[in-house]
Amino acid sequence: MIRRLNHHEIDFEKYSGCIEKSVQKNMYARREILDFWCESWDILVWKDYEYVMPLPLTKKFSQKFVTCPIFCQQLGIFGKNDSSEINERFLSYMQANLDIYLYSFNAGNHFQRDLSFRKNYFIPCGTYADQKKKFSKGRKSAIKSATGLDFQQITLNSVILEFIKRFYKGLSKEKDKKMMLDYLQFLHGKEMIKVCSASLNGELRTVALMGDDGETLYLIGLVSDEKFRNENPTSFIIDQILQDNLENRNFSFMGSNVRNIEIFNKSFGAELMKYPVIQHSKKEVLIQFLKNKLS
């Protein structure tokens, strides 16, 4: 029932149709996003594209490994509904036939066995007034204290890119930072990005960078000049984004397992949505690679 299709064998019209109609639909599984991030990618398919599972691949030691790229938070199995039985078949096929370093399923995938999980916080589309009732007292206070700040939706321009280069802290490797900046410009070209700013007297305090697929905003980065932290620009900007967008967009914080960030996300009344992951250490991957070579 499950077949692996190499990239050149994929019927992309059927693949994209399955993703668009799926109950697990997200931005990360779109063809153009995977084409940008992946060295190469294949898929597993159930019957005639009733369910699909993208496989991002990278090559190390002359061997291809499955590993999810940066900013592709949740891939997994996509279809007309979620079936733990079908999900198990995909997982068993994957484990038996592929070398896996890191693979993240989506929050809509459920299994009959225990897997590790990572955290995401998510706010479903609805009224801002109802959502604000769920804000923590501390977050409401921080928003109230953020007086005098100016909120704007802006374009991704050279000033914003320079601000990101100076203050973005989420990535330690320079090559990853460059890829992130390239990704932002790629999304800009596809009209799939929303950029918002909080400033005081024309001076930037915080910039929010979000992927936008027409249904959900995905928080790629919240970039701040830390010397203005006491002005609470991050609380202010998220609140403004929710006010302007929540009636027609879901909002995904894209994380986080980091405690301080988790508390921040949760304080806006966001729902915890765990997604299953398979991850092996580099040592485990190397051992498996050597076993395959010797077998």
Question: What is the predicted role of each segment?
Answer:
Residues 1, 6-64, 169, 173-188, ...:
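N-terminal charged segments
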Residues 1-7, 110-174, 292:
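Acyltransferase donor/substrate-recognition loop-hinge adjacent to the catalytic core
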Residues 17, 31-87, 200-226:
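Conserved donor-binding loop and adjoining core beta-sheet/short helix segment
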Residues 60-68, 203, 279-295:
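Alpha-helical membrane-targeting segments
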Residues 84-120:
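Non-catalytic accessory segments adjacent to catalytic cores
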Residues 89, 192-288:
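Aromatic (often tryptophan-rich) hydrophobic motifs at membrane interfaces
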Residues 102, 152, 250-254:
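Short catalytic-loop micro-motif centered on adjacent basic/acidic residues
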Residues 154-206:
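Short, conserved active-site entrance elements at the starts or edges of catalytic domains
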